């Protein structure tokens, strides 16, 4: 049944950067900048690792996530996700 359910963009993005260990820059709503790689995530938070230290970051505190390298989530051109 889980295979029939399409993954949302947020989960697809986070799963891709987790699997590829893509370095991220995360800006929080209060302006704080965090950097690291995602090692785990769920519906409410993600675990960010850098220099051997992990930080639990609540998703409601995140404003922007910028990958350190270009990523390709979907097959085809830039306007194919829909």
UniProtKB/Swiss-Prot annotation:
It holds the Pfam family Hfq. Keywords: RNA-binding, Stress response. PROSITE patterns: SM. GO terms for biological process: regulation of DNA-templated transcription; regulation of RNA stability; regulation of translation, ncRNA-mediated. Residues 11-71 form the Sm domain. GO terms for molecular function: RNA binding. One of its GO terms (cellular component) is cytosol. It comes from the Bacteria. Gene3D superfamilies: 2.30.30.100. Belongs to the Hfq family. PANTHER family: RNA-BINDING PROTEIN HFQ. Homohexamer. RNA chaperone that binds small regulatory RNA (sRNAs) and mRNAs to facilitate mRNA translational regulation in response to envelope stress, environmental stress and changes in metabolite concentrations. Also binds with high specificity to tRNAs. This is RNA-binding protein Hfq. It comes from Rhodopseudomonas palustris (strain HaA2).
């Amino acid at each position: 049944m889980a295979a029939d359910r399409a993954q949302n963009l947020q989960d697809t993005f986070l799963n891709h950067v987790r699997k590829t260990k893509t370095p991220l820059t995360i800006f929080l709503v209060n302006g704080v900048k965090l950097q690291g790689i995602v090692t785990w995530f769920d519906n409410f938070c993600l675990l960010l690792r850098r220099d051997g230290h992990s930080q639990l970051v609540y998703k409601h505190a995140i404003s922007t996530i910028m990958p350190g390298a270009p990523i390709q989530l979907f097959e085809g051109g830039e306007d194919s996700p829909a």
